[in-house]
UniProtKB/Swiss-Prot annotation:
It comes from the Bacteria. It holds the Pfam family YidD. Coiled coil: none annotated. Belongs to the UPF0161 family. GO terms for cellular component: plasma membrane. It is a peripheral membrane protein. Could be involved in insertion of integral membrane proteins into the membrane. It is found in: Cell inner membrane. PANTHER family: MEMBRANE PROTEIN INSERTION EFFICIENCY FACTOR-RELATED. Its main location: membrane. Keywords: Cell inner membrane, Cell membrane, Membrane. This is Putative membrane protein insertion efficiency factor. It comes from Gloeothece citriformis (strain PCC 7424).
Length: 75
């Protein structure tokens, strides 16, 4: 599942994203954030974090540096 989601993001970056001007308000970009989140947290939580990030990426949000959160150690 993880490989499929990352493949979809890479496909978007290769085929769809070049058709539009750069518009992501965040650093790293939303697609890079998605790849990092899925690699770090797995398919379910990574996709959830990515969805939240995409929903925040709009003209009324200031954007800026917003890295993937670190993995919290289990107690």
């Amino acid at each position: 599942m993880k490989i499929v989601l990352i493949g979809l993001i890479r496909g978007y970056r290769t085929f769809i994203s070049p058709l539009f001007p750069p518009s992501c308000r965040f650093q790293p970009t939303c697609s890079q954030y998605g790849i990092e989140a899925i690699e770090r947290f797995g398919a379910i939580k990574g996709a959830w974090l990515t969805l939240g990030r995409i929903l925040r990426c709009h003209p009324f949000h200031p954007g800026g540096y917003d890295p993937v959160p670190p993995v919290k150690p289990k107690k």
